[in-house]
């Protein structure tokens, strides 16, 4: 039986811990969830923006390479689309035991776990009897050089086996480790949307080389950010670790998060 949903996952920032020497303070992992029956709409959305911006037909849209005035119409289209977005925002300097996360892909795996939990809740709560498929999601990661997706499958398998011990909150009827694929953004248009979402939240939290953040992009996406009973934080936006909470509650640069995404 085929899946009901398709989930596209991409990231922004890096996993390094050399702050002040090139590593980003934040790492963002985002998912864009769409119904498989409407997946063609993601292709049309990207094609429409590409032609609006006068970009070559086959060239993938990379959010960071677009000018500010080109990013806005792209995000306006996403905000108006029939999809949902989930983002995990990791503040690396707040991690209590950074040495634990220097191990290869460890930080990435943690972010994948938190993202998978929220994606699975959305899919579980939005399945309907009319839907085609078995209620699960096909997960498409943006291909990262040097990473084997068998490793992610193995990691999710491990979480599934140890769900109770590790207090994993993934709904396994929605997320199935054997339904994971990795593609390059040029072959799956939804990945270009996931890149735009991850980059938007990254720019909202990560200061530029001149010390400024830009939160307009993240605010524009509010109509499609997953929420539960009006609550965004903990659902469509997961901040991690908890040690970053004080900073987010008090610093001026996170005002957008406190006001737009309560």
PLM regions and their residue ranges:
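Phosphate-ester processing/binding pockets and catalytic centers
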Residues: 1-262
């Amino acid at each position: 039986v085929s899946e009901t949903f398709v989930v596209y996952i991409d990231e922004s920032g890096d996993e390094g811990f050399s702050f002040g020497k090139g590593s980003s303070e934040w790492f963002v992992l985002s998912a864009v969830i769409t119904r498989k029956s409407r997946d063609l709409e993601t292709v049309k959305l990207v094609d429409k923006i590409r032609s609006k911006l006068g970009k070559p037909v086959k060239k993938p849209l990379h959010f960071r390479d677009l000018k500010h005035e080109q990013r806005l119409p792209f995000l306006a289209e996403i905000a108006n689309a029939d999809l949902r977005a989930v983002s995990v925002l990791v503040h690396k300097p707040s991690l209590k035991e950074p040495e634990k996360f220097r191990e290869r892909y460890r930080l990435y795996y943690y972010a994948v776990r938190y993202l998978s939990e929220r994606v699975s809740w959305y899919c579980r709560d939005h399945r309907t009897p009319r839907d085609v498929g078995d209620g699960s999601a096909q997960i498409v990661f943006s291909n990262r050089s040097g990473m084997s997706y068998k490793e992610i499958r193995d990691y999710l398998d491990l979480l599934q086996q140890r769900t109770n011990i590790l207090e994993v909150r993934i709904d396994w009827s929605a997320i199935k480790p054997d339904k994971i694929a990795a593609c390059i953004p040029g072959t799956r248009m939804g990945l270009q949307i996931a890149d735009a979402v991850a980059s938007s939240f990254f720019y909202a939290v990560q200061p530029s080389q001149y010390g400024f953040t830009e939160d307009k992009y993240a605010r524009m996406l509010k109509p499609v950010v997953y929420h539960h009973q009006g609550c965004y934080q903990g659902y469509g936006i997961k901040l991690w670790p908890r040690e970053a909470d004080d900073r987010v509650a008090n610093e001026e640069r996170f005002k957008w998060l406190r006001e737009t995404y309560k």
